Design a protein with these regions (language model features):
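Conserved small/polar residues in nucleotide/adenosyl-binding loops
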Residues: 223-229
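Histidine/acidic residue-rich metal-binding segments in metalloenzymes
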Residues: 207-219
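N-terminal binding-site loop/beta-alpha segment at the start of enzyme catalytic domains
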Residues: 1-96
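Hydrophobic packing residues within well-ordered alpha-helices of enzyme cores
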Residues: 81, 179-182, 215, 233
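Conserved, mostly hydrophobic/aromatic
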Residues: 22, 34, 64, 81, ...
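Short, well-ordered coil/turn segments that N-cap beta-strands
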Residues: 28-32, 60-62, 92-96, 133-137, ...
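Glycine/proline-rich, positively charged
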Residues: 54, 105-210
Length: 233
């Protein structure tokens, strides 16, 4: 592995990747993003994980997508990514879009895995500590849990932006009915939903019926939960 102290990103990295504006914003994202769901946890080879981040960055991939439960073990992907940043990317934080999510099971008890204000506020603080970041560029509600009112979740996401813990907000895997409520509330609050994530592949095209047209109606970009993640606008 290349010595981290000697790592310098290639000079032409931004010539290697097309970028698109995301939602109703001035933010551009690369056509391909790197998700850290697997291969970056505590059970994985840290040197290999580091090399994958470097390779991605050298090829114009600036968007790195995390979640608090990514690993395995849960939380370890965020911790490892934070270490990779400290050891290799000092001075390059402003060239990266780093996103994270919360809402799936993360810790024991009734507060460790839903879309409530209690869970989301605790989760983003934990995620910021694990990564060593001051803020996330994008923070998602990882799922609609079927119980928490969407209004509570959305108000929490908006407050997260107001508190400076995230620059933009998004939702992941929301059914159309709940997604519409979220889009409407965010737009009225002046913090429009930037992006939605969906399971979408040649084997799973259910979102084409309602979710994707709905995102287009509200000018919300979407990413495919596939490997790699591809941005659509």
């Amino acid at each position: 592995m290349e010595n981290s102290l000697n790592y310098q990103p290639v000079a032409d990295r931004y010539e290697r990747m097309p970028y698109k504006y995301c939602g109703k914003s001035g933010l551009q994202l690369p056509l391909i993003s790197l998700g850290l769901w697997h291969n970056f946890g505590s059970v994985d080879n840290f040197d290999v994980a580091t090399d994958m981040i470097k390779y991605a960055f050298d090829h114009g991939i600036t968007h790195f997508d995390l979640a608090n439960n990514y690993g395995p073990v849960p939380g370890s992907a965020e911790s490892n990514f934070g270490r990779i940043l400290r050891e290799n990317f000092q001075g390059y934080r402003d060239e990266m879009i780093i996103s994270s999510k919360a809402g799936h099971e993360m810790w024991a008890g009734p507060y460790g895995g839903n879309s409530s204000r209690k869970n989301l506020m605790a989760s983003i603080d934990q995620s910021l500590r694990r990564t060593g970041l001051e803020y996330f560029d994008i923070f998602y509600s990882h799922r609609y849990d079927g119980v928490t009112p969407v209004e509570e979740t959305v108000r929490t996401l908006i407050d997260i932006v107001k508190q400076g813990k995230a620059l933009y907000i998004g939702i992941s895997k929301y059914p159309p009915e709940q997604a519409r409520i979220a889009y409407e509330m965010m737009a009225k609050a002046g913090a429009p939903c930037l992006i939605s994530q969906y399971r979408y592949s040649m084997f799973d095209r259910a979102v084409e019926a309602e979710s994707l047209p709905l995102a287009a109606e509200y000018a919300v970009s979407y990413t495919h939960l596939t490997l790699p993640t591809i941005l659509r606008v």
